[in-house]
Each structure stands twice: as C-alpha cells, then as structure tokens.
Amino acid sequence: YEPFPEEVIRQMASRIADLHFAPTDVNKQALLKENIDNDKIYVVGNTVIDALFCLSEDVISQAKKFYEENNIEINDKLILITAHRRENHGERIDRIINAISYLAKKYDDHIFVIPVHPNPNVKEKFYSRLSDLKNIKLLKPLDYPYLVYLMKNAKLILTDSGGIQEEAPSFACPTLVMRYETERKEGIEVGVSKLVGADYDKIVAEAEKILTKDISQTRL
C-alpha cells in the first residue's frame, strides 16, 4: 500500500466504521467503490482547509518577522521543498536530493527552503548533500503558521506531504508531488498538482517548466 502506513490504517478502519465523514464528493465516490453503504457516508468538508483560513493576519505577520530575523528572503523566486515519506527512504531520497541539487545550481537566483524532517534517514542526507549550496536554506521543522507563510508565497512546491497536497491548491501554487501514488486526487484533477514520483528526470523537467517563468505566469 502507498502511501504507507496511512492507507493501510484507513482500509482497516473503514472495515469496522459505522460512519464515514468524507471531505469531498471525490472521497465519497472512492468509498462507494469500496462498497461502503451510501447512507453511512457524509460529505463534511475539509478541516485542514478550515484550519488554514483560520490563521489570523497577526499570526502571518509573526511568520514574516521570523524569516526576516533569520535572513531568509521571501520573494517571488521561492521554492518550498518537503520530503520525509517512509516509502521515499533509500534510493528514492537520493534521487530527490540529486534533483534538488541540480535545480539549485542551475537556478541560483532562486531560494530553496527545506524544512528538514528529524528522521536520521532524511536529515543526514539533506545536510551532507545540500548544506554547501548558498541558495538552499535547511531549517528545523516549522510551526504551522510559518509553513503556511511559505506556501502562500512560493513560486513552486515540491513535496511528498499529504497535508501540503491539500493546502497548496488554496494558494494556486504549482505543486510537484514526489510520490507514485496519492490519496489526494483533487489537486491533480484541477491541474495545480502533478505526480512526479521520486524520478529525477520528471522532477527536473516539470520544475523547469515553472522556474523558467515569472510567478505571475505560474499561479494557477
């Protein structure tokens, strides 16, 4: 199952659940295909997006101040990157890092901001391979408002995160999903997101389609 372990857990829980609260009609249709009774499914909206729009301007201003104090310039050439999925450990994370390194060197006028997951399988590789590149900013895991501020201002997002896949379309930010399977289909269906897996060539090719343009041309 991918994504792992979430999809396994969801499948197990679905077998015994009496009620199913689906964020969207797309999710409801997926449950119906799994032979869940229609009268057990309720479309209730997405609480992740609710939380996103509950952030106050004061909180967003604090996030802006955080980056200013840490000498991280947030401009229209910002790329946000997150990668931590268990299924991407090993050779996959190596290919992802190779792609990031290539892009950062070629587009050295862009800023690549990477909140690094504390898992040693991820952290050690990111710091050993990317810390010498001046336009890559490796950060500790960010508080939620600080991450939202980056999404709001990013020219491009590269991620294997489930949550960011849900949130990025709210900002119309082009997003490359570094997975081979995703349970979040909505962003892909509306054209904001694209599956690229951990494929070096696909990551580079799709990123370059965005990075060669002005942000005003890429916001969807």
What is each of the regions a protein language model found here?
Residues Y1-I114, N119-L220:
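Nucleotide-activated sugar donor-binding and catalytic core shared by glycosyltransferases
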